[in-house]
Amino acid sequence: MTAMNSNFSYPALGVDGISSQISPIRDVWSTNLQQEMNLIMSLIERYPVVSMDTEFPGVVARPLGVFKSSDDYHYQTLRANVDSLKIIQIGLALSDEEGNAPVEACTWQFNFTFNLQDDMYAPESIELLTKSGIDFKKHQEVGIEPADFAELLIGSGLVLQEEVTWITFHSGYDFAYLLKAMTQIPLPAEYEEFYKILCIYFPKNYDIKYIMKSVLNNSKGLQDIADDLQIHRIGPQHQAGSDALLTARIFFEIRSRYFDGSIDSRMLNQLYGLGSTGSVLWHNNSSTPQIQFRDLPGAHPSPTPSNAGIPTTLTNTSSAPNFANSTFRFPPRVV
């Protein structure tokens, strides 16, 4: 990428003297999905940098057994949860390689169908999202079907294109939910296969958290990094559109401030918390591999399809909101 120019800006942000008459974040439901995807398709060639965030219903399951490494455990935790849960929001923010956003629109927040009566979730996650302004009644009534979104996304020019760069923050779960929607099958049994598929659909991607930790030894969350850089958030925290827009602005700021306008290619296609190899075996409370679900109120997990490759032995745990007896957990994503 080229260095960010001096005119870096996002339209209508409502801060630093920029007009706020038009919101930069466009809500997308089933009723306007085709219209908004058409707009994105008309812009992607000129604005081929896509910053992305998702909101999902928490973490409700963990694998038990023997694992090749801690990274293997982290991936199996991700896999068990993504295969069992439904996405709630996806946020996408477009810009060009200098960080300029389109005038027509710059950020889209896709809202997916979700039913609090039928779909599984972690209660504390839903409570947080509700406090952040997510309208679950509307999600139930006019939310987007993931398959409909995926069909349009595959043909949009955003994925399967080496010319498009994806920017994320602690993005293992984000990409996993997108891949699940596009492939319509459970995630691969092994991380190596997941990574191969990831690089087909998203051949060029940067994870800001990986970059900050690897180069600057900074493991702060998205909001804390924004505060350090004095970047103002637009929209509510813990909503995908706002987080995607903030991700975009942080990326171009750190690229300019710390990397002289060009990030080392070694940072490309690395996911924070996943991917390093190791031969040591990791144990987690059981000699028999299985998936352990939290004992949640309301909806309960359905057995994983046999072709998923995930062990389908389910065990109830206590109703406590954490896995106190778990040796490892996927690093919590802090925003």
Curated annotation (Swiss-Prot):
One GO-annotated biological process of the protein: nuclear-transcribed mRNA catabolic process, deadenylation-dependent decay
Q: Which Pfam families match?
A: CAF1
Write the record's keywords in alphabetical order, separated by commas. Activator, Cytoplasm, Exonuclease, Hydrolase, Magnesium, Manganese, Metal-binding, Nuclease, Nucleus, Phosphoprotein, Repressor, RNA-binding, Transcription, Transcription regulation, Zinc
- The record's top EC class is hydrolase
List GO molecular-function terms, semicolon-separated. chromatin binding; manganese ion binding; metal ion binding; mRNA binding; poly(A)-specific ribonuclease activity; RNA nuclease activity; zinc ion binding
Query: Phosphoserine is carried by which residues?
Result: S302, S306
Q: Which domain of life is it from?
A: Eukaryota
Q: Which residues bind Mg(2+)?
A: D53, E55, D174, D243
UniProt name for this protein: Poly(A) ribonuclease pop2
Which lineage is the organism of this entry classified under, starting from the top rank? Eukaryota, Fungi, Dikarya, Ascomycota, Taphrinomycotina
